[in-house]
Regions:
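Active-site bordering "gate/hinge" segments
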Residues: 1-254
Length: 254
């Protein structure tokens, strides 16, 4: 994989004096494993890469994208974006941002361990999670799915106004969905663990959480009606906040 920022710079070198150019370069990969009853049910890996170019000339904007990271293709995207701008409607407010002089924060979001993590080890984590849930309680009747998912992404942005930024991050998670039963009563529950690298995942915590949530309401009975203080589960609270934040987002009125 070429240096993303250097690729963006080389595209910018082709910009003319009467236009503004923004180049976005990205590369990423995602792998997912699902197991069921001790065997692999699904194993997928998807990799993406590309260069996006925006050109602003005489108040007209043109865009183009190419799904490759080689320099000739990236430069061709600039030519296409330039050509597309010729047919765009004039927007007197169109323009690129100027550097504000503020250094972006340095965030520790990348773990090299994940990028080179063997596929066999990914499968092993999903299988072990399923095994722990099954053995966690005799009332567990089935593990619907046990998943391991990871991915990484790298991006670079460079503009003719002098902005240059890069970002890269990794992430992974384990997720398990279990069904528990006692007589005719059946309940479900799930557990998960997230991290920047496989070594940061907590198998035991995910398994225990799934077993607990699947079994704790077995045999439960409806409570009498009353005015009481409601204590919300943290996941329920997060869901409610997610709904509210979406409705209050400025993007809803743009």
């Amino acid at each position: 994989v070429p240096d993303l920022l250097n690729l963006a710079r080389r595209v910018l070198e082709q910009a003319t004096a009467d236009e503004e150019v923004e180049v976005y370069v990205s590369h990423g990969r995602e792998t997912s494993v699902r197991v069921f009853e001790g065997a692999i049910e699904q194993l997928e890996t998807a990799e993406s890469a590309g260069v996006g170019v925006r050109v602003i000339s005489a108040g007209r904007q043109g865009f183009s994208y190419v799904g490759a990271l080689d320099e000739p293709a990236a430069k061709e995207a600039l030519i296409e974006a330039r050509d597309n701008a010729r047919f765009a409607t004039v927007d007197e407010h169109a323009g690129l941002a100027s550097p504000d002089g503020v250094e972006p924060p340095v965030l520790d979001l990348w773990r090299e361990e994940l990028v080179s993590f063997p596929t066999d080890d990914r499968v092993a984590l999903a299988l072990e999670l399923e095994r722990r849930v099954r053995s966690g309680d005799s009332r567990i009747r089935q593990v619907v799915s046990s998943d391991y998912v990871d991915g990484f992404g790298e991006t670079a942005i460079a503009t003719s106004r002098g902005i240059e930024v890069t970002d890269r991050q990794t992430g992974c998670y384990l997720f398990v969905h279990a069904v528990a039963g006692d007589g005719d009563d059946t309940q479900t529950g799930f557990g998960y663990s997230v991290g920047r690298a496989p070594g940061e995942l907590d198998l035991e915590a995910a398994a225990v959480d799934a077993v607990d949530r699947a079994t704790r309401l077995l045999g439960a009975r409806k409570a009498r009606s009353a005015k009481l203080t409601a204590v919300l589960d943290r996941r329920v609270t997060a869901t409610l906040l997610g709904i509210l934040s979406g409705t209050l987002s400025g993007e809803e009125v743009v």
